[in-house]
């Protein structure tokens, strides 16, 4: 297991990882607006497919609201649960944006490159950082270093009304050593 090799792999594949993030950012998964329910569903489908592309046994799970995405990777050692959310805040008032918030762009700034678009920082960027780290680790080392459960919800920005009931119903599956 080589952290240096994994970091080098991340650097060498940064463009592809950025492209995947930009693709997810283009999905207007606004959980608080019923007009975007199909987009929330699309974001969940996108995440399931992306997790499956790196060998994660991932599924979309129905809730009374927006779906959960749950994925598992078997492994030795401790069980890690990673939580994130794929929904985003509304963009109103739209006239305050200098571009379409769902047309993310990589921009050069005096402090370096940044990604501007709704969800880049909260929470799609953070969510994909973990997924991309797992993708790189697996590419370099063949397997992930421990058992991992990926747990993504689509209602965090609307108060997570389905989260606690889902966690109670799936407590055994979601139980982990670390989260």
Which residues does each PLM region occupy?
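Acidic/His- and Gly-rich active-site-bordering loop/insert found
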Residues: 2-120, 137-146
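Acidic/histidine-rich catalytic neighborhood of metal-dependent amide-processing enzymes
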Residues: 114, 121-179
């Amino acid at each position: 297991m080589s952290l240096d090799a994994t970091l080098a792999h991340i650097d060498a594949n940064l463009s592809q990882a950025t492209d995947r993030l930009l693709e997810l950012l283009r999905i207007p998964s606004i959980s608080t607006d019923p007009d975007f329910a199909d987009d929330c569903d699309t974001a969940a489908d996108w995440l399931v497919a992306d997790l499956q592309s790196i060998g994660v046994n991932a599924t979309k799970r129905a809730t009374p609201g927006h779906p959960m995405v749950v994925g598992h990777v078997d492994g030795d050692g401790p069980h890690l649960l990673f939580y994130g959310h794929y929904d985003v805040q509304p963009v109103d008032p739209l006239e305050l944006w200098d571009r379409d918030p769902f047309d993310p762009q990589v921009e050069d700034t005096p402090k370096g490159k940044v990604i501007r678009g709704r969800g880049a920082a909260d929470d799609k960027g953070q969510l994909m950082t973990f997924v991309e780290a797992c993708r790189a680790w697996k590419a370099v080392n063949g397997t992930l270093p421990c058992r991992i459960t990926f747990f993504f919800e689509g209602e965090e920005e609307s108060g997570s009304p389905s989260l606690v009931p889902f966690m109670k119903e799936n407590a055994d599956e979601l139980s982990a050593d670390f989260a």
